[in-house]
């Protein structure tokens, strides 16, 4: 999100480092996988469940990435950077929880019925 990008920019500023923006091959792969789901599964509960699962893969990747950055910032004593990174980490965890609730509140059951 824009807020997350702003926080990364703040971390870079606080630490006084230059950041070269690069594309993340892993994230591009997850996005491509989502596109394949859309192209290969008809609209309906099964596709919805697959897309929720794909979105959770993205969130888990982001949680792992921000968790690692938080651990490094803590180890290095970068308290301002840690605060900003933790905020984003908590947002990612919250999004993952919402996706889990969406799947468990009927999305997976509807997909299972459709697949049966």
Regions of interest found by a model, annotated:
Residues 1-116:
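Amphipathic alpha-helical hairpins
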């Amino acid at each position: 999100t824009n807020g997350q990008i702003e926080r990364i920019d703040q971390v870079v500023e606080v630490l006084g480092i230059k950041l070269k923006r690069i594309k993340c091959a892993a994230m591009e792969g997850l996005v491509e996988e989502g596109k394949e789901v859309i192209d290969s599964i008809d609209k309906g509960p099964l596709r919805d469940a697959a897309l929720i699962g794909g979105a959770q893969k993205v969130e888990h990747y982001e949680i792992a990435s921000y968790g690692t950055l938080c651990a490094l910032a803590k180890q290095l004593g970068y308290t301002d950077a840690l605060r900003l990174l933790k905020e984003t980490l908590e947002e990612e965890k919250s999004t993952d929880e919402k996706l889990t609730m969406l799947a468990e509140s009927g999305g997976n059951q509807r997909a299972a019925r459709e697949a049966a």
